[in-house]
């Protein structure tokens, strides 16, 4: 697996979302209960940007049709999506965001 480094990453605040691009793929990054989480930024229902949605507990809610995904597993927790989203391993090291899938 390849580790992708994003230098100078100033991460989201607790309970917030941001997005980064890795090899042309948008990745939503969130800090939830002190844990950095990263998932594909595209909802599997209608391709809306999850980083523009909301965090509820340990899930992200799509802003378009309110589909809900678990940030740790990518599983669909509710709403119209039928397929899970991709999950990335995320870590902050030496001022850089490291993502791996």
Residue ranges and their predicted role:
Residues 68:
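Short Gly/Pro-enriched loop/turn and capping motifs at secondary-structure junctions
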Residues 43, 62-65:
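Short cysteine clusters
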Residues 79:
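Short glycine/proline-centered loop/turn elements that form peptide/ligand docking sites
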């Amino acid at each position: 697996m390849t580790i992708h480094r994003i230098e100078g990453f100033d991460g989201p605040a607790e309970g917030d979302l941001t997005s980064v691009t890795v090899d042309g793929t948008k990745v939503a990054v969130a800090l939830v209960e002190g844990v950095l989480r990263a998932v594909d930024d595209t909802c599997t229902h209608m391709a809306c940007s999850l980083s523009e949605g909301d965090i509820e507990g340990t899930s992200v809610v799509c802003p378009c049709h309110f589909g809900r995904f678990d940030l740790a597993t990518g599983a669909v927790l509710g709403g119209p999506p039928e397929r899970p989203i991709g999950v990335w391993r995320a870590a902050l090291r030496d001022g850089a965001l490291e993502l791996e899938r």
